[in-house]
Amino acid sequence: KAVAQQVSHLEAVALLGLVASLNRGVDAVGNPFKHGGTAYVRGAALDPLKLKGEAQFQRLCRKLEAGVDFLQTQPVYHRPQVEAMGEVLQRACQTVGCPRPKLLIGMVPPRTAEIARHFNRSIPG
């Protein structure tokens, strides 16, 4: 018998799989919905500073295999990071054999001059 769990007990790839199931009209334990599936868009996080290792590359590939529709990055302020991230994403899509998902580049605009100075001192790029 299935036991309900908190959403926080699901990691990203499992949650993407659950959303795909809901979109097909099947609940978390395999029961069909009476009125068809949902139309959720599946998104996942992507940290451009953590894309250098093989483990993170494989995690990105698993997200792509799970059918992610878009990726949202952590804040990025350095163009070479964005370009490198695009190259890694392209390679991952080729590895998995999937279309490239939309990429939403995260930004945190500084609201004050003091915050801008802090960003300049503390944030790479």
Q: Can you describe what each PLM-predicted range is?
A:
Residues 52-64:
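Short, acidic/polar
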Residues 12-20, 60, 79-86, 90:
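Generic structural signal for well-ordered alpha-helices
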Residues 63, 67, 105:
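Conserved, mostly hydrophobic/aromatic
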Residues 6-38, 43-50, 93-125:
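Active-site pocket-lining/capping segments in soluble small-molecule metabolic enzymes
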Residues 1, 69-79:
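Catalytic beta/alpha-barrel core
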Residues 66-71, 96-99:
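Glycine-rich loops and low-complexity Gly/Arg-rich segments
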Residues 2-7, 54:
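Short, solvent-exposed loop/turn segments at secondary-structure boundaries
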Residues 50-52, 77-81:
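Acidic-and-aromatic substrate-binding clefts and catalytic sites of carbohydrate-active enzymes
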